[in-house]
Amino acid sequence: MENFFNQFFENIGEDKNREGLKETPKRVQELWKFLYKGYKEDPRVALKSAYFQGVCDEMIVAQNIEFYSTCEHHLLPFLGNISLGYIPKEKIVGISAIAKLIEIYSKRLQIQERLTTQITETFDEIIEPRGVIVVCEAKHLCMSMQGVQKQNAIIKTSVLRGLFKKDPKTRAEFMQLLKS
């Protein structure tokens, strides 16, 4: 890792021995362990250990769960919030498990579209609800800092399964709950 940073500093014309940079390789290495710890965790385990048999058959919504991730194209952050709604069949999941699921997938190199899909598919596979919907809204620093330099652009993605995909009324109810 140190060789990588020494080469990086040299390539951009920086002095690797400058006081403020001496410990940077170590600090960044520790930061990267945290930012990409999702590779060392199994999202299925997070859900399997946190559900219980439930009697609720109405929509449950976890809204505005904050996240940040790293764009795999430019290695710059994208951040925002995710809302997940589901209609249970037999299993109800603890809300903290939804946040953990989001954290595990977001702590990997990502694109927003895949992040949204992975969360939806894993939730659908493990919890087996009658329907699940995930909406992700994020600001991408790669759009703000370089290229088109659009500071206020928000990207929205959604993935729907089951009743949310088949029934427009169910989908509309979820969207209305997000607005309220």
Swiss-Prot record:
Organism whose genome encodes this protein: Helicobacter pylori (strain HPAG1)
GO BP terms, alphabetized: one-carbon metabolic process; tetrahydrobiopterin biosynthetic process; tetrahydrofolate biosynthetic process
Lineage: Bacteria, Pseudomonadati, Campylobacterota, Epsilonproteobacteria, Campylobacterales
Database matches in InterPro entries: GTP-CH-I_C/QueF, GTP-CH-I_N, GTP_CycHdrlase_I, GTP_CycHdrlase_I_CS, GTP_CycHdrlase_I_dom
First-tier enzyme category under EC: hydrolase
Keyword Transcription: no
Reactions the enzyme catalyzes: GTP + H2O = 7,8-dihydroneopterin 3'-triphosphate + formate + H(+)
Subunit structure: Toroid-shaped homodecamer, composed of two pentamers of five dimers.
GO molecular function ontology, one term from the record: zinc ion binding
Protein's name according to its UniProt entry: GTP cyclohydrolase 1
Source domain of life: Bacteria
Pathway: Cofactor biosynthesis; 7,8-dihydroneopterin triphosphate biosynthesis; 7,8-dihydroneopterin triphosphate from GTP: step 1/1
PROSITE patterns in UniProt: GTP_CYCLOHYDROL_1_1, GTP_CYCLOHYDROL_1_2
Enzyme Commission code: 3.5.4.16
Entry's family note: Belongs to the GTP cyclohydrolase I family.
Keyword annotations from UniProtKB, A to Z: GTP-binding, Hydrolase, Metal-binding, Nucleotide-binding, One-carbon metabolism, Zinc
Cellular component, GO annotation: cytoplasm
Coiled-coil zones: none
Sites where the protein binds Zn(2+): C71, H74, C142
